[in-house]
């Protein structure tokens, strides 16, 4: 596991060399790009790449383009395009006027393919997909193509007819002529164009041939003036092909490709295919389910842009794959919310507390601080009366050793911001369930401090005024998967699902100040955790809160 502290970014070291006097890009503006495929929602894994691309541009006062990689006609959707834009803006990044689609370059891709054919560096091949595998060879045997020496004019004619739609899918491909004996199979005359009679979400039916990613991507980078094409580690073996393309067609720029390890997180899956299966089979409520690792899911759960950026930056940039504990992501959120979230009182599993010596019908306002870490956030007034709600866990009819909360004839306890109380007994129903707790209060202890300065031996507990509060539904989330590595080879990831990843509590009580709560606000429910109003379901008169993260955890960075 990577050490979760700020680490040296080897990408920046490469860039420093490139822009230094005599370097490849000396005197040039550092220019990166983020090229998501619009066939799904961005997740926390994409977020690392996004922050590397945009963050690198920020560091060097450079530019970062947003380019939708929509060269594959079968997967793209406008819904995903808009969602990706929203997520990037939410994280605090902007691409200015540099928003592009890969499909915008189809005509240029075609022209460069023709250029390669004319140079004798590409040819039309008739091998079927099955034959292609058969002729591919192995480490000791070169690949073979009986069409490699097809005359240039014949390849030009066939390629033009491929574009005109004369042939069915897979009848022909266009292959780069590189090295059939290369130890890197990506260089064994790779396919750079294929026939696909598919409707494209932006180009319509204009095209029936589509460039392969390994051909289109370096051309797009070069045409946009990208200096550093930053991508994940699986493209390391594709770098020779990337370089070959930009060196053999007449593009105006020659970008440098640099690879970094993808972000892996335990207790989750980041495969779009598997995430889609969770959605389509009803294991989660949608792409924005707060248990999902998608940015829209994390946002709905209450994650902040700062916490996610901080997480990605502290994980660092690695050259080899690593898996980061999900608990570290939670740590970063907890760290942020501890500083910024307003403290409020909420009771999730309520039981009534009656202060028997407090006047019936009386109500008063007590002062509670909004955030002890931020005095500038001030205080608020909270109503207090004879009848309160407290947590069931804050009372035991028969106490256990070292229990310091309420029990009959136990020690004084402090009601947060209000008074000291002493439990005198309880009321039970016919099933021997406690339905009401009885206590007396010290009228001279307003604010929680006794007038005589005596030591309070009991705990401080939170409460909600039963005469002035709101009902709420609270959703508490846990890891979506019990298994820390549900994505491992040979595992059925669905069999690893945590059946207790969602607990819905109804009949919760929250203080009246939350009556109009709405996303994206975040709150610390005192002693319980950090919560946020659900962005879809929370509304005045129907309050719904999601637990963003627990109040404490044993996880510490670097462990």
Residue ranges and their predicted role:
Residues 24, 93, 122, 168, ...:
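Intrinsically disordered or highly flexible coil/loop and linker segments, enriched in small
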Residues 36-38, 67-75, 97-107, 130, ...:
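Conserved short loop/turn motifs at secondary-structure junctions
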Residues 66, 70-72, 115-275, 329, ...:
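Active-site cores that bind ATP or allylic diphosphates and position pyrophosphate for catalysis
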Residues 80-107, 112-113, 120-123:
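A glycine-rich helix N-cap at a beta->alpha junction
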Residues 311-319, 326-559:
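Substrate/cofactor-recognition hotspot
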């Amino acid at each position: 596991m990577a050490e979760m502290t700020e680490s040296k970014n080897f990408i920046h070291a490469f860039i420093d060399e490139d822009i230094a006097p005599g370097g490849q890009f000396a005197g040039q503006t550092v220019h990166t790009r983020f090229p998501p495929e619009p066939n799904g929602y961005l997740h926390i894994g994409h977020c690392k790449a996004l922050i590397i691309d945009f963050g690198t541009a920020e560091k060097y006062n450079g530019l970062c383009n947003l380019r939708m990689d929509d060269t594959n006609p079968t997967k793209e959707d406008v819904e995903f395009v808009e969602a990706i834009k929203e997520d990037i803006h939410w994280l605090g990044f902007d691409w200015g006027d540099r928003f592009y689609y890969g499909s915008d370059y189809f005509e240029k891709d075609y022209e460069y393919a023709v250029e390669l054919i004319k140079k004798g560096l590409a040819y039309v091949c008739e091998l079927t997909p099955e034959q292609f595998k058969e002729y591919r060879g192995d480490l000791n045997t070169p690949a073979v193509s009986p069409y490699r020496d097809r005359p240039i004019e014949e390849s030009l004619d066939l390629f033009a007819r491929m574009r005109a739609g004369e042939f069915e899918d897979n009848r022909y491909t266009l292959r780069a002529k590189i090295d059939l004996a290369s130890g890197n199979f990506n260089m064994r005359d790779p396919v750079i164009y294929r026939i696909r009679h598919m409707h494209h979400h932006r180009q319509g039916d204009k095209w029936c041939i589509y460039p392969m990613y390994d051909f289109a991507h370096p051309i797009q980078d070069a045409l946009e003036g990208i200096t550093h094409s930053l991508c994940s580690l699986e493209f390391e073996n594709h770098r020779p092909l990337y370089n070959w393309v930009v060196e053999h067609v007449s593009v105006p720029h020659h970008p440098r490709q640099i690879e970094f390890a993808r972000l892996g997180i335990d207790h989750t899956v980041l495969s779009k295919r598997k995430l889609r299966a969770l959605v389509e089979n009803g294991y989660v409520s949608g792409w924005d389910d707060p248990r999902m690792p998608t940015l829209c899911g994390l946002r709905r759960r209450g994650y902040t842009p700062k916490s996610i950026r901080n997480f990605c930056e502290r994980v660092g940039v690695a050259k080899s794959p690593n898996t980061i504990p999900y608990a570290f992501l939670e740590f970063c959120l907890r760290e942020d919310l501890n500083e910024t979230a307003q403290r409020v009182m909420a009771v999730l599993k309520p039981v009534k507390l009656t202060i028997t010596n407090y006047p019936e019908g009386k109500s008063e306002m007590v002062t509670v601080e909004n955030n002890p870490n931020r005095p500038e956030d001030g205080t608020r007034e909270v109503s207090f009366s004879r009848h309160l709600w407290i947590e069931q866990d804050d009372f035991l009819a028969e106490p256990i050793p070292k229990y310091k909360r309420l029990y009959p004839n136990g020690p004084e306890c402090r009601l947060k911001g209000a008074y000291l109380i002493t439990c005198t007994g309880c009321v039970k129903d016919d099933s021997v369930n406690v339905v009401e707790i009885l206590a007396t209060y010290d009228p001279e202890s307003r604010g929680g401090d006794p007038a005589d300065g005596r030591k309070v031996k009991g705990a401080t507990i939170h409460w909600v005024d039963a005469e002035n509060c709101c009902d709420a539904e609270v959703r508490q989330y846990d890891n979506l998967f019990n298994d820390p590595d549900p994505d491992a080879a040979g595992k059925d990831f669905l069999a690893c699902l945590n059946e207790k990843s969602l607990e819905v509590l109804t009949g919760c009580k929250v203080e009246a100040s939350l009556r109009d709560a709405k996303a994206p606000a975040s709150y610390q429910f005192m002693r319980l955790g950090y919560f946020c109003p659900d962005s879809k379901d929370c509304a005045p008169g129907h309050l719904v809160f999601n637990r963003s993260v627990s109040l404490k955890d044993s996880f510490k960075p670097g462990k």
